[in-house]
Amino acid sequence: MAKPTPAPRATPFLLAAVLSIVVVAASGAEARWYGGGGGGGYSPSPSPVSSIVSEQLYASLFLHKDDAACPARGFYTYASFVRAATRFPRFAATGCADARKREVAAFLAQISHETTGGWATAPDGPYAWGLCYKEEINPQSSYCDATDKQWPCYPGKSYHGRGPIQISWNFNYGPAGQALGFDGLRNPEIVANCSDIAFQTALWFWMTPRDTKPSCHQVMVGEYRPGPADVAANRTAGFGLVTNIVNGGLECNRAGDARVNNRIGFYRRYCQVLGVDVGPNLDCEHQQPF
């Protein structure tokens, strides 16, 4: 792998136990950009994603995202999600009905894991706590790859994980900003401050092939065509390959990784809710990272 894969380091998943303490204590026993607000009652124009996930369903999938204990409470609105999706017209709109639903389930599962506040015995189960965080907690560094001259780091800026997919590193913030219309190198903080931009960065990552990697979208809708190197690395199409694209350097080619299993747990739940089978190759245990 030429460069690290964008992913949080001190992930919300690893910090869920801390949140569980907070939850128990509280209960007693992220011109063209839209701002982050927007409460209930949003009526989007018909769109591929809104035809699959209604506002009511969205609220039920992310049951605890606005709990007082979640740092991202009030941030990840349905309106922002749908508005962001309109910038990517092929998202949730490619292939048959099952393929479209499966892609949405996979996307929501990946962002749920990246932002989860759940734990094994959490109220309503561990898979009801997606979108609880909008920013990496206690980042270990500024995630600046100084060798990347195309996307040079700006002094004093940190490129740690932010937003639903926890985009990280200067070589991701830079091109994401260029594609979406903001300065990702000088103003990476906007990903944690504007919910529309936060969702757009996640969808940009989802839809965009990078270097030797296919896009997550291509994998989930059947457009991925493995080359000889992919075949040799056992990078077979399925949800597991999406995990490889997102964070394979840390999670793939190893047995029983808890993070991989957590992603699969979210994915199974969302596929069940949407009434679609999960498809093959859910994990990346035997895949070489990109």
From Swiss-Prot:
Name of a matching Pfam family? Glyco_hydro_19
Query: Which keywords are on file for this protein?
Result: Carbohydrate metabolism, Disulfide bond, Glycoprotein, Glycosidase, Hydrolase, Polysaccharide degradation, Signal
List all disulphide bridges recorded for this chain. C70-C132, C144-C153, C252-C284
| Keyword Oxidoreductase among record annotations | no
Q: Which PROSITE patterns match?
A: CHITINASE_19_1, CHITINASE_19_2
Catalysed transformations (reactions): Random endo-hydrolysis of N-acetyl-beta-D-glucosaminide (1->4)-beta-linkages in chitin and chitodextrins
What EC number is given for this enzyme?
3.2.1.14
Residues bearing attached sugar chains per UniProt: N193, N234
Q: What class of enzyme is it?
A: hydrolase
Q: Which GO terms describe its molecular function?
A: chitinase activity; endochitinase activity
Q: Which SUPFAM superfamilies match?
A: Lysozyme-like
In terms of superkingdom, the source organism counts as Eukaryota
Q: Which residues form the signal peptide?
A: 1-28
Q: Where is the active site?
A: E114 (proton donor)
InterPro entries according to UniProt: Glyco_hydro_19, Glyco_hydro_19_cat, Lysozyme-like_dom_sf
- Describe tissue expression: Expressed at low levels in roots, leaves and meristems.
Gene3D superfamilies with a match to the protein in the record: 1.10.530.10, Endochitinase, domain 2
- Report which residue ranges the record marks as coiled coil: none
Alphabetical GO biological process terms: cell wall macromolecule catabolic process; chitin catabolic process; polysaccharide catabolic process
- Similarity comment: Belongs to the glycosyl hydrolase 19 family. Chitinase class I subfamily.
Question: Which PANTHER family does UniProt cross-reference here?
Answer: CHITINASE 10, CHITINASE-RELATED
- What protein is this chain from? Chitinase 10
